[in-house]
Curated annotation (Swiss-Prot):
Protein name (database record): ATP-dependent Clp protease ATP-binding subunit ClpX
Gene3D superfamilies with a match to the protein in the record: 1.10.8.60, ClpX chaperone, C4-type zinc finger domain (6.20.220.10), P-loop containing nucleotide triphosphate hydrolases (3.40.50.300)
Gene: clpX
Organism: Cupriavidus metallidurans (strain ATCC 43123 / DSM 2839 / NBRC 102507 / CH34)
Family: Belongs to the ClpX chaperone family.
Start and end residues of each ClpX-type ZB domain: 3-56
NCBIfam families: clpX, PRK05342.1
Binding site for ATP: P123, T124, G125, S126, G127, K128, T129, L130
Length: 425
């Protein structure tokens, strides 16, 4: 380093960048045959700061454009899931806030944003799993479905809760970074409810014990996962997966929860202002949106787990009109799928409105919701799909109400010929 003062006999040194002599600046730093003054260093630092700031702004703008807004998330859900408008809105906001939080994790800030996991409550076949699957596909993140009924505490026969993270890793080719931003959907969460309000002296390895094990996973922990799906043994190197930023969505039918809610509301609704309404008159779909944490505790979930699932969305039971829409409107609607299957044989499929209504009514009677629609349609088309490759000249297959009820076979329309019934010679 060359100081400002120097003897006249010494050779005068100059900054290699601005050309100022050592007498014109405070400091002159020497490198291998190169010199730089303090003023040029300050200027370089200023340029670097400005460029870094511009890069951060561009990254923030890119983040906003990459992440779909709640309205866009809702519109995407509408393409695949019919009805459940309030649940879609709640999910869209929760998922948007979660991934917006992840985008800003690296920034230093006084306010630390906590994770908001989601609890979906609704009857079988109302769209809980489909909503979670559609969200993961939209956001292009790893996704896994786990069945809570197969889980047990560590050390007991059954699946360990850490197996969920192992499956998530498998779905993204063991890329830990990707897995740590994925979505885990835990189905049948209501089936691991505590068997009674009072703690039992016997070990509940598939109830409260599993809830306690899930608690750490959902809250955020370092899960040890064997590489490439191997079994755990002491002398093995494990993959460490941080679950802090994994979004957990838990779903369940919670059969009987409406009774717990009605008992609570009956106690609070006393006096002249109380609305007199019999339990039979109150639909489950009307009661479930009134769910409070105390109801879930009474049902059998532990308070700590409920606290880790702050976003609660309830799904309504699907009526006949909604089930008919599900058959024909979504992008991957069942009718469209079977029309495509028959189109591969060069045959058109027509399902009349009366048949759609009959399918919906049958699903409601079976209490299977949207999940039961496929089996009803498959059963009605089974004989046609079996015989169709052997038939020649079939132009169209027509399904009417009598086909669904089993009173008549599907109608086959031949090219320039009179219609015939399937299976007749």
């Amino acid at each position: 380093m060359a100081d400002k003062k120097g003897s006249s006999s010494e050779k005068l040194l100059y900054c290699s960048f601005c050309g100022k002599s050592q007498h014109e600046v405070k400091k002159l730093i020497a490198g291998p045959s190169v010199f730089i003054c303090d003023e040029c260093i300050d200027l370089c630092n200023e340029i670097i700061r400005d460029e870094a700031s511009a890069t951060d702004k561009d990254a923030t703008a890119a983040t906003r454009s990459d992440l779909p807004t709640p309205h866009e998330i809702r519109e995407s859900l509408d393409q695949y899931v019919i009805g459940q408008d309030q649940a879609k809105k709640i999910l869209a906001v929760a998922v948007y806030n979660h991934y917006k939080r992840l985008k800003h994790l690296g920034k230093k800030d006084d306010v630390e944003l906590s994770k908001s996991n989601i609890l979906l409550i609704g009857p079988t076949g109302s769209g809980k799993t489909l909503l979670a699957q559609t969200l993961a596909r939209l956001l292009n993140v790893p996704f896994v479905i786990a069945d809570a009924t197969t889980l047990t505490e560590a050390g007991y026969v059954g699946e360990d809760v850490e197996n969920i993270i192992q499956k998530l890793l498998q779905n993204c080719n063991y890329e830990v970074e990707k897995a740590q931003r994925g979505i885990v959907y835990i189905d049948e969460i209501d089936k691991i409810s505590r068997k009674s309000d009072n703690p039992s002296i016997t070990r509940d390895v598939s109830g409260e014990g599993v809830q306690q094990a899930l608690l750490k996973l959902i809250e955020g922990t370092m899960a040890s996962v064997p590489p490439q799906g191997g079994r755990k043994h002491p002398n093995q190197d494990f993959l460490q997966v941080d679950t802090t930023n994994i979004l957990f969505i838990c779903g369940g039918a919670f059969d009987g929860l409406e009774k717990v809610i009605m008992q609570r509301s009956d106690k609070t609704g006393i006096g002249f202002a109380a609305q007199v309404q019999s339990k039979e008159e109150r639909e489950v779909s009307e009661v479930l949106p009134q769910t409070e944490p105390e109801d879930l505790i009474k049902f059998g979930l532990i308070p700590e787990l409920i606290g880790r699932l702050p976003v609660v969305a309830t799904l309504a039971k699907l009526d006949e009109a909604a089930l008919m829409q599900i058959l024909i409107e979504p992008k991957n609607a069942l009718v469209k799928q079977y029309q495509k299957l028959l189109a591969m044989e060069g045959v058109e499929l027509e399902i009349r409105p009366a048949a759609l209504s009959a399918i919906a009514r049958k699903a409601i009677r079976r209490k299977t919701g949207a999940r039961g629609l496929r089996s009803i349609l498959e059963q009605s088309l089974m004989d046609v799909m079996y015989d169709l490759p052997n038939y020649k000249g079939v132009q169209k297959v027509v399904i009417d109400e009598n086909t669904i009820t089993g009173d008549a076979a599907p109608l086959l329309v031949y090219e320039e010929q009179q219609p015939k019934v399937a299976g007749s010679n």
